[in-house]
Every structure is written in C-alpha cells, then in structure tokens.
Amino acid sequence: MKKIYIAIFCSMFLSGSLLAQTIPSPKEFFGFNIGDDYQLANFTQTEAYFKKLTASPRTKYVDIGLTEEGRHQFMLVISSPENIKKLEQYRTISKKMAHAEGLTDEEAHQLSLDGKVVVWIDGGLHATEVLGIHQLIETSYQLVTRNDDETKKILDKDIILMVHANPDGQELISNWYMKEKDPQKRNMNVPRLWEKYVGHDNNRDSYMMNMKESQNITHQQFLDWIPQIVYNHHQSGPAGSVVAGPPFRDPFNYLYDPLLMTSIDEVGSAMNSRLNAEGKPGYTQRSGTEFSTWFNGGVRTATYFHNTVGLLTEMIGSPAPSTIPVVPERLIPNSATPFPVLPQTWHFRQSVEYSLSLNYAVLNYAARHSDELLYNMYRMGKNSIERGSKDYWTLSPKRSDAIVEAAKAGRPAVDSTAGGGRGGRGGAAGAVTIGGARNGNIALKYYDEVLKNPELRDPRGYIISVDQPDFATAVKFVNLCIRSGLIVQKATAAFTVNGKNYPAGSYILKTNQAFRPEVLDRFEPENHPNDFLYPGGPPIKPYDMTGWTVAYQMGIKFDRILDDFNGPFQRISYGELQPMPLASAPATAKNGYFISPTANNSFIAVNDLLQAGVGVYRLTEASATQPAGSFYVAYSEKAKAVLDKAAKELYVKAVTAPKKPKNIEPINTARIALWDQYGGSMPSGWTRWMMEQYHFPFKVVYPQEFDAGDLKSKFDVIILVGGAVPPPGRDGGNFGGGGRGGRSAGEIPDEYKTWTGRLTVEKTVPLLKTFLEAGGTIVTVGTSANLAYALNLPVHNALVDVVGGKEVPFSGDKFYIPGTILRASVDTRQPANYGMENEVDVMFDNSPVFKLDADAASKGVKPLMWFSTDKPLRSGWAWGQQYLKDDVAAFSAQVGAGTLYSFGPEITFRAQPHGTFKLLFNELYKKGSQK
C-alpha cells in the first residue's frame, strides 16, 4: 500500500512538473512580469497566451463571438480536470438552478450538492483601465499552475469563467502605449474611442445589447451559463484609498430579492477580510464609494435582475508609478474604510497582487459556500415564480408616500415638530406626523388602502399586441427580452383578455418566472428615492441613470394584466430570437406606394430606395388614408424590388396608392456631417452606430474642418451631439487638452493632427451661422443647444432664478433630474415631428430646457416639444419637476434660408430611445427637386 501511495505522489509531482514546463510564465511569454512598470500586453499577445494555457487539462478555451472590429472574443473556463470533462453536466445544473422551474426544494438541495458553483471574472471592459485584463492574465496563470491546497479546493468546487470583455480596446490601447520607446512618455491618449462606437459606455449596454461584445457577454451570463457570481474589474479607486468594492451604498433596486443583497454583502465582506488578513490596507465600501446597485445596464448590475451576485471593484494603479495622495478623511478608520492605506508611492504590480487576492477571496468564498450559492440562486428564482403567481405588491418610496398621503387625508395633520418628524428621530425635513402620532403608529387601514389595493398590484404579465404602429420595433424589444434570458410566449391564434381582442402573433411575458425582476424592469417605471446628502442639502449623484424603462424608451405599446390569464400561447425556447414578421409584398401598382412615417424601419427602406436612385416624396398634408409625413414612391421595377425586400426583412408595409398625391415634397439623400473630436465622443459614436443601422450616409467631421468654413458647399445637414458646442464664454469639446486628449500638438501623430481642435463661439459659431443662412440644416442634441444662445436666438434657459438682475441656474436642491424618463407633448403638425404621436417619453439627463421670448414666433422660432404638466416624471427621479410645466423641450428656428433644430432631451441616448429616433431622422433629408 505504501508503494502505491508513493507511486501516486510521484505521478502527481511529475505531471505538475511537466505542466509547468509546458505552460510558460507570463515573464517567459511576454518578456516581462505582469505588473512591471511601463509594460502592457496587447490583445494579440494575450489571446496567444491564453491559448498556451489550454495545454493544461484544467482549461477549456471558448470563442464567444466576434467583436465590432471582427476580433474573436474569448472565455477561458478553468476548473479541475475532472470537472472540465463534465462541463456540460455542471452547466446544465447551473441553468436549472437559475430557472428554478419544475424543481422541488429537495431536488434543488440535491442539485446544489451535485453541481459546481459558476464564477465569472472578467477583465478589460474599459480598455484604459489596464489593470483589468492584466489581472485576468495573472490570475489565469496562477489558477492553471498552482498546486496549493486552496487552489485545488477552488478548482474542485468552482467552474471559473475568465472572460475578456473588450479585445478591440486592449489592442488599441496597448499598441498605442507601447509604441513609444521612452517609457516615461508612454500614454493612453488614443485618438478615438477604445470600443469602436461607444467607448466607456460599453458598460451601459447590458439591457439593450446593441454592441456585439455586449451580446457575447450577456449570452453567457443570461443564457449559456448563468453564473452564480459575476466579478467585474474596473479602475480607479477613490483618492486616498486603494480599492472600492462591495458592500455597496444605497439605494438598491426594489425589485431585487432580499437574499441577493445579503449575498452581495457576504461576498464583499470576504473580499475585505482577505485583504485585511494579508495586511493589504485601503479597501473602502458602502458610503466610501459612489457605487450603488440601482442601475440595470452594466456588466455587473444587469446580473442583479437575474439573481446573480454581482461584484465590482475599482482599483488604483497604472503602468506608470503613481502616488496615493493625502486625503485626511480617508485616514480615519470607520465602517466604510476599516483599514486605511497610508500615502505612498504605488506600483502597478501592487494592484495586480491586490486583484489576485480579491479574486482568490471570491473563489475561496464560492468554494466554501458552493451549495449555498447554487441553492440560493434557485431560492431567489423560486421566490420570483411564486410572487408572479399571486397578488403581490412591490415596496417602494411611492408606496410609502401613498400610505402617508392616505393617512393625511384620513385625519388632520399636526405640526411635525410635535412628534419629532418622520419616525421621531433623524427624519427628513418636512416629515409629517399624522393625527398627533408618529408615522410609525399610522393605522393599519392606511397600509391596507395602498398595499392591499388590487389596482396597485404588480402585473401578472404583459401583452404586446401585433396591432400597434411600429410592430417591427416591438419585435426588437421582444428580442431584447429573449437575449436577456426571459420566458416569452407567442399567441398562435387570436385571443381575448379582459374584454380586449388581440391578434395571433402577439407576444406575452408573464411575471411568474425566475427572472421576474428583469421582466418588471423592462415594463415598469423605476421609482428612485429622493436621495440627498442631508435634509435640505445637495443631491447625491446617482451612479448612472435613475430611470430607463426600456418599453417606454422604445415607444412600445403594451397592456399590463393584473390578474392571471391564459390563451393559445406557445412558449418560445430560451434564446430563440424572433424573426421580423413578413409584411405582405407590395402589389404591382401603377400609381405607386405609401410607406408609413410611424415605423422606424421605414427610414431604412427609404434610404435604400434613395441609394437605388428611386424618387421618394413626403406628404406635406394628410390624405384621406395617410397621415402627413408619409413617404410616397412612384412605381418602378426597381422600387418594387427594394420594397419587396423591406417587406420580407423589415416588416415595412407598402400600401398601394390609388393615385399620385398632390401635396407632396421630394426628398433626397443629404450630405450629412456628424461632429466628433480627437479622443472620441460617446454621443457621437452612438449616433454613428445608429445611422449605420438605418442606412444614412454621413461623414464624421472634426473641428478643424468646421473651422475651414465653406460648409454649405460640402454639407446639407450638420449634427451636433451633446458636448460639441460650448456654453457662452467657454471652449467646446468635453475632453481636455484643447481637443487633443491631453497631449501637446507636437506629440500627435501626423495622421491624427487634423482631428484636433474644438468648436468655439468665436470662430466656429459664425461659420455655422453662415451655413444656416445659406440654407443648411443643423440638428443639436442635449447641451449643444448652446448654439441657440450663441446665435442670439429669442430663447433662454428656463431653469434659472434671477438674482441681482442676473440669471443663476437652479441649484441641485431645487431642481435635479438625472438620467430620467419624462413625458413631453409634441406638435405633430410640424414636419420635424412627422410620424410622432401627441405625447412621447423622452430621456432627460439634466438636459437643457427653454423659454421662448414673446417675439420668438415672429422671428421664426416654433416649439416642437414641451412639458404640459407639472408632473412629467415617467420613470426615475425628478426633483423639482414642477418647474418644467409649460417649458419648451425642443424647438425649430429659421436662420436665413436654413433651420436649426434644437432638442434638449437626449433623443439618441446610447441608441436606446427608439421612440424618439424619428425626431433626428426626419431632419436628415435634403428637400427639393428630384435629381
């Protein structure tokens, strides 16, 4: 027996030695240690190294899809050799536990023992945060080659998904950094966005999944593996600390299962404790960071709506040595930062070592609590199914406020000071005591009035009818739900619910499913709390948006169904994307065709027609059957071929015209200029992507070309997105360094020198005015409405107080509406608004709002959109929303022979608000005689 043990030991030792010889260390492969000063690996090298790691039986290399630039995005699965052989079995268990369908608690308990916990660790999402991908390299090497007890236990209990989040960005940033021979001069100030279209916003795309990388990642997270833990690495940590991480600050989203929040706190505590045990100070959490768990849309945060424990760390460190500064308040130990770090010089390798410790903390926690994590994911999914199968009321601030209002209406309120405010102690300013008692003693009947009110129940489901103006966009919305791992059903025949008839082909989403939080989040408004530093103080800036309800943004028509319902519904398989329904092919019609202006896809068809040389017109007045703005196309074989394809692929319905209409205006393809700048603009990048999807030809134009003048000879339309036009008295562009990304002119490579510069009031605005006067069209979005002020048009900022005869913008404690959906009224008579309805949901991010001067109309300025109520909030947080009543959200202004269209709301925000895309598209055609 002793000889057998010796033989086994020798075999294991030799296999480990051979493995070490087969797999090169990072130093051997890259020529430097990961974390060495002034050294970065690019994607080509990293991809090759990860393929080297596949020599280990602990690994499986998976290509998860192509990036926007055509690179292969990979995921390295790491576990014990035994587990690698049975990956499909463990993947199936992970998905079963996540879906929680058809399982008893006993069966789930057994599966939690039979399965392996799945942990996702990614790197490189934000390419300039170079620690992310480099810690992934180092951690993967350690997991593949180490044979200590902790690593072996981790490999036995965990399935680890090591995911490259942004191959294109790593290649760009690292190549740029390393091409400089002098290490002291190396920098990351690249001339363009490090994700082809959206740069930093690639971490805001996880519920829309516009980018290919987002689709690749979410497919693994929500369909293929559904990990129990997702760890998303970022930089940089708050000044005076090393790393910010979980537990996170409030608020958290009220749709989550409470077990999710306590699980995040548990893992976060394990991470903090690991660093403390290793003598690594500087971890800050909760109030020590800006990061919350409210937002849906990030690689970490989107997982919360799928019952996954999502983790984020933001850590200091760069290839160039840096310094931890003196921040006195960070030097006081407290619950946010129990072990402060002292000011010191900091090297990149230290950040790599911290990351390795944190990764091991997460993996060790997962190994020790493998069955709990698996079972708890099941439990959260089961809870969701049960909540969606009965009457349920989600708790939120609006429900709490409604109880208070019910109590106030039921008995007289008294001075709040008598009872010490809300809860008697530490209450918000203005808290009301009801009937002489503290709010905590409000009668139960007032609770019942709200949280047992059948009209206030959460919906049992939603119906998206075929019968809506833009069903093609509704199908896109349905596919987002399917990509997000939701159960979607489709009606195989007509049916009736609550007395309303629905056609076959309509879609149904019920809430009795494991990812119920995600279902509700797609349809229901977010109810963000009033979050201030202290009563009467400034607002606490949210991590990102506060309201984003996708169905609102996309303009989807749907019905909320509060009671259980059934019908001839066929369940769609998980991940089975829906093809666009087939529209009837247009008949041969000698008088031509009408195309609806209400459907976004109509613009694709129109642009394809124009590119094919087919004449296209728009109705300037409504006909007996078609609204104003409808497209008219004369019959030709070429036109019919384009429309046949559009009917088949885009669900564009071409309606036969009984005769050629009289009140029509020809349109042509316009020469479109889209502003951008050195270093890249995310709003411009998103707009660029949108225009490519809808087949608008355009040219990206940089400030120097604008300043060269003679714009009308080159362009018909100019698009100025947020950040392009400075406010009066300031220079343009939202990147530093005079539009050079922080570099001196001499450091810019020759091929990019024409990209530098910025728009200015002094030089650029007069040239833009000349362009307008000559008949050009300019569209501004968001803050670029500053152009109207620079042109001295009869419009003013509506959100100001007048102090000492001067306009002073509202303070944050008076007005604050960050990343929120509001309802605006629309003048549908205006050509700029063709295809729109009388009201529209708009994305408002502390956006410009206008008051028109008394003589504005006589000077050619017309309101396009405005806020007609003192409560325009639809989803999110709108402090001071009453100040918006009757203010203008968008306007058109005649300037000479041209027109300026200014939209305060973000009508193209991250390519999400399909409901307002037409507000841009309508302005992108040249009007006049056919060529």
At which residue positions do the language-model features occur?
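Short, solvent-exposed turn/loop segments enriched in Gly/Ser/Thr/Pro and often Arg
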Residues: M162-N166, Y177, N232-G240, S784
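Structured alpha-helical segments in the cores of large, soluble enzyme domains
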Residues: E107-H109, K181-R192, I217, I229-G237, ...
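Bacterial N-terminal signal peptides
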Residues: A7-S17
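Acidic, glycine-rich active-site loops and adjacent beta-strand->loop/helix elements
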Residues: L125-A127, V163-D168, S206-M208, G237
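Intrinsic-disorder/low-complexity accessory segments
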Residues: Q21-D158, R204-D205, N210-K212, N216, ...
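Divalent-metal coordination cores built from histidine and acidic residues
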Residues: L155-I160, P167-R204
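Positively charged n-region of N-terminal signal peptides that target proteins for export
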Residues: M1-I4
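Core alpha/beta catalytic barrel or barrel-like domain that forms the active/cofactor pocket
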Residues: N187-M208, V230-F248, V267, M271
